[in-house]
Each structure stands twice: as C-alpha cells, then as structure tokens.
Amino acid sequence: MTRLWPEGEPVETWAEEGVPARFYWNGVPQHIIHICNRWRVHTRWWEPGHTIWREYWKVVTDKDLLCLLYQDLLSSTWLLARLYD
C-alpha cells in the first residue's frame, strides 16, 4: 500500500551539492542508491505568503524503498511525500 503525506513528513536529509544522498526514516538511515526522476514545482507565486517552490526527487534506497522526497526551496527543509510499494 502506498503511503502519502500531502503536507510532507519532515525527514533529516543529507545532500551533496544539492542532490540528496541519504535520509532518516523511522530512525533508520536510508542511503539513496538511485535517482529515478526529479522536477521542480513553483506555483502560487502571485499570492504573497502562499508561494510553493519545491524540488521533488523520486529515489530508491539501499533498503529497497521507492520514495518521493522534496525540498522546500523557500525554507530549505526536506520532506517525505510518498512511499511506494
């Protein structure tokens, strides 16, 4: 069953030159072994205080998790948006 967090679940993430390398999920380190895709979303820029500017990363970890992470580019925080089965 796919798990989805519409607002994102904060995760401690380490990035190398802006590319996520690992993150912690439930206290377990997840090393990213493959990046499947990445894209940016920049919307609601016309509404002060409501701008959404994110960079999404679909990744595979060394624990065989397929995940969708994103970095909020306004706050520099990393969040987990989805875990796929």
Please describe what each predicted stretch is.
Residues 1-85:
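Non-catalytic peripheral regions of nucleotide-handling enzymes
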